[in-house]
């Protein structure tokens, strides 16, 4: 830092030469800004070398994949599976590692529901979705940010540490590396991974008509099970009404069998004359005999 300051001061305020000029005292005005400060000896000419911290490098240009992902339209689809679950899909061209954010937007600046998912891939099932009380309309915003980096550091690498002053004093030749050494990967939140977010605004009421929501769709399995259970209930109901009839009829007297039993008994035994009928016939015979006797006495 000191040689650089001396060079700037010398350029701003040039000093007059003393006893032969600056050629006799090469170290008076300092070294150029693009020269190395680690010379091996005073007689050796100073060779210009590249310093990692002398000038910042050119800004990094995004790769073609990242540029395509940034310019690509949102390819996000949301389907409602159950009452409180969503199935989210997005295109793979957006990246490998994706972060997903879901939050409500109709609460006047306060998110009634918010969820975050880190390093996920499609498809993603979001369960236990927070629903507004009273069946009110709920607007949500879904943001997906994806990056093309998988566990490597994308930020600018730091230069290596400067050599010690003892090595420079001893005159040992030291050379700075042409490229700075890579540092070991740090935590994920220090890696500086670029993400390209794409957001989608939707409402839960708009998803009710989609074929992915099973509450509005009746699968063939449910229909068949419902028909079978209805048939079973009808059969059991009819059987419950019919099965007591033959059992109760077995305990009741049968009219046809009673008539057959009476006819056979009458044919086997002689007919009996009733007592009243016999007395009337005897009275009639006695009256006839008395009348005959009376008529015979009158003729004599």
UniProtKB/Swiss-Prot annotation:
Expression triggers: Up-regulated during Ras-induced senescence.
Residues passing through the membrane, by range: 231-251, 273-293
Sample GO molecular function, one term: peptide binding
Glycosylated sites: 75
GO CC annotations, alphabetized: membrane
Record's bilayer topology term: Multi-pass membrane protein
PTMs per UniProt: N-glycosylated.
Keywords: Glycoprotein, Membrane, Signal, Transmembrane, Transmembrane helix
Signal peptide: 1-20
Protein location: Membrane
InterPro entries documented for this protein: TMEM158
Main subcellular location: membrane
Family to which this protein belongs: Belongs to the TMEM158 family.
Function: Receptor for brain injury-derived neurotrophic peptide (BINP), a synthetic 13-mer peptide.
Name by which UniProt lists this protein: Transmembrane protein 158
Gene: TMEM158
